[in-house]
Amino acid sequence: MKLLILLASAILCLPACTEQEPPIGSAELSSPTAEAASIDELVAEYLLLELSMGRHDAGHVDAYFGPESYAQQAEAEGLSLAQIAQRATVLTQTLESLPDSGNDDMLKLRIRGLELRLEALQTRIALNQGSEIDFDDESMRLFEATAPHHDAAHFEEILAQIDALLPGEEPLPERVEAFRKQFIIPDDRLASVFEAALEECRRRTLQHIDLPAHESFSIEYVTNKPWSGYNWYQGNANSLIQVNTDLPKYIQDAVRLGCHEGYPGHHTYNALLEQKLVLGKGWLEFSLYPLFSPQSLIAEGSANYGVDLAFPANERVEYEREHLFPLARLNADHAERYYQLLELLGKLNYAGNEAARGYLNGDIDAEQAQQWLVNYALYTPEKAEKSISFYDGYRSYVINYNYGKDLVASYVEAGGADAEARWLRFIRLLSSPLSPSDLTDLSD
């Protein structure tokens, strides 16, 4: 594929740009026009810019399995942040000037998706250059979504229910932690429990989704990470799933991470995008996953919702009690109350957003954010400290887990209560270039 290098003869210089910046391309265009290139040529430029950003921001490119030549060119050109921003501006203008795609809805989604990715790229450049951006504005520019706000009173109502469930004299966070300890998976049982759960997640998913016959995954157990689990998609329907063992893993974490990172979560999502869009349509932009982009809201939201889809109603509780509790050699005598607690703790999930919002906006410091998480999310002090590390690295990304799940649930369940219908809408979401705003537009 011929790589088009886009350069307007007169480009507005961004704040970080200087007159000393060298030229950023050999071909000049008087203005970005639709005749300048096909969309595939524009995608080639897009891939080069994202890969160039990855040289400045190590976590920016979450996965890339496209042509190696683009990665080599990004390394060879060594574009500065200002140069990437300039070329992204021209590329956005070119995309906006493309002829109307008429009734081709997929093409419209493709072009809009590229524009949103470029807006997110510009936002990450600004952040890397030291710009201060309000939390909600940042999340909209990166993920095309703004999470709802909740005050302390919202969480206090839920905390009162937990207090009634686990009465005692000690502070509520200490009571919760003491009760939960009996459900920690022993270290020597962790691998067997996780691998059993992941296989069950896979079995249930494959009953509804046709994945490539050669799809596969491997598991690693790691430490010193700010996250609890991670899927590193390798391409060719293969994933490396890492489980962080810094903090204790509870019995419910096995299914949660198995579905989230694997089936029908990240591994499934990436495999379908590769199969349907990269190989099926030749849309090479989907051979690169920019972590800080609207795609992440759908990725994280669908991965979290996928747990409920694969294990509807009480099926998850039954599976864990009948299979994982014995495998972990845990006593299930208090399991019923434990699952009642988990349901209530899930309702505190948005407390993490409030901690991140206040901390990143400078309204509270790290110590205050940690205390908020202990008081209102009922985190252990260790988990609260780990969360601050996550906020430092991933910032407003935190909204993708809970608000993303809510948006995906709304979209999928708008099709009715029939289980198979929900799976079909879920598959549609995972196989298409839908953006977060499409989830509300298409849920009607």
Regions found by a protein language model. Give the residues of each.
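N-terminal maturation segment of proteins
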Residues: C17-D444
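Bacterial N-terminal signal peptides
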Residues: I5-C13
